[in-house]
Amino acid sequence: MNQKPSLFARLADGSLVLQILVGIIAGVILATVSKSGAESVAFLGQLFVGALKAIAPILVFILVAASIANQKKNAKTNMRPIVILYLFGTFSAAVTAVLMSFAFPTTLALTLDAAQASPPEGIGEVIHTLLFQLVDNPVNAVITGNYIGILAWGVGLGLALHHATDSTKLVFADVSHGVSQMVRFIIRLAPIGIFGLVSSTFATTGFSAIAGYMHLLLVLLGAMAIMALIINPAIVFFKIRRNPYPLVFTCLRESGVTAFFTRSSAANIPVNMALCEKLKLHEDTYSVSIPLGATINMGGAAITITILTLAAANSMGIQVDILTAILLSVVAGVSACGASGVAGGSLLLIPLACSLFGISNDVAMQVVAVGFIIGVIQDSAETGLNSSTDVIFTAAACEAAERKENA
């Protein structure tokens, strides 16, 4: 007689996406029925995001070092085409945002108090910050979640261990698998974590605060939807020469949904790593491309910077010609690649883009304040687009390389 699996075993083996959907619905219901009850379960979401953020730096460092150390000689990692896809995708997002802003011009009532923050003075400061992140103390890089530094030291250690004995390489490979197992366990807790995140978000913010900026929000979300459902699939089709939507929808469902609620590309790195493993991608490739993507693949950030900057220009009565808009796309694309190196991310890079039009820092910071008000949805959608695109482009490059080899 076969023994029936326990409830815990059934939950552990069940569909994670379905469980997350149940968590979202339960969170909305709880926030609607009892605001105090919803606020009391906020710690579940904080615990989940905290666990992901805690494991992600260690996972990236160990995986990168182990994959490079164990890499066979002359093995191809396909990193060059992936980086090109990341940069092209980010620039395409900025151009899409410009077109959306021209089609649906947005103006803002700039009467808010300027947000208290310290935006970077220019592109030079963003690059300066990134270069110093590169040479950060490796222990400090892991503690603070500085993924530029983690990648640099992980690659350095991996290259140094490339000529080590097989037993040393095996130890690193075993540690890498051990950390991956811990990540799988944390990801299985996603439904509980997302239940807490959704409950607290609806209870504390609701939609009343963002109702006044609905037009701006719709333009932002529209640009991100076009990027996710039209531009990205077109780029993927160009690479793999087949229907891109099965891959795109898989990545949006399994990476984008989690990223939407955690609102952190760094916290979503373990989720993306697990998805790449599920898609049977080359570990030597995705162990480097996913954390790199969390740093430089910032299509969502480019959209946010561009649309809010053009909204500021429209509000000030500044006429923007097409050449200036193209220049803005380049600036937004480059700035977005440095968004992970700035506290406050894409929003605090808006003053940098506003400087193109001679908009004062005081006015620009009022636009940033508007960004923080709609941030509960804008930041979630931006992170969902950024993070899911990391896997989409990595998978597309890997499949294109395989097709080329088999031709």
From Swiss-Prot:
Reaction catalysed by this enzyme:
L-serine(in) + Na(+)(in) = L-serine(out) + Na(+)(out); L-threonine(in) + Na(+)(in) = L-threonine(out) + Na(+)(out)
Cellular component aspect of the GO annotation:
plasma membrane
Q: Which UniProt keywords apply?
A: Amino-acid transport, Cell inner membrane, Cell membrane, Membrane, Symport, Transmembrane, Transmembrane helix, Transport
Against InterPro entries, the record matches this protein to: Na-dicarboxylate_symporter (IPR001991), Na:dicarbo_symporter_sf (IPR036458), Ser_Thr_transp_SstT (IPR023025)
Name its GO BP terms in alphabetical order. serine transport; threonine transport
* Pfam families reported for this sequence: SDF
Instruction: Write out the transmembrane intervals.
Output: 14-34, 48-68, 82-102, 141-161, 192-212, 218-238, 290-310, 316-336, 363-383
Q: How does the record classify its membrane topology?
A: Multi-pass membrane protein
Q: Spell out the subcellular localization from the entry.
A: Cell inner membrane
Q: Which domain of life is it from?
A: Bacteria
Q: Name one GO molecular function term.
A: neutral L-amino acid:sodium symporter activity
PANTHER family xrefs: PROTON/GLUTAMATE-ASPARTATE SYMPORTER (PTHR42865), SERINE_THREONINE TRANSPORTER SSTT (PTHR42865:SF8)
Instruction: Family membership, please give it.
Output: Belongs to the dicarboxylate/amino acid:cation symporter (DAACS) (TC 2.A.23) family.
Q: What's its job? A: Involved in the import of serine and threonine into the cell, with the concomitant import of sodium (symport system).
Q: What is this protein called?
A: Serine/threonine transporter SstT
Whichever gene encodes this chain, its name is sstT
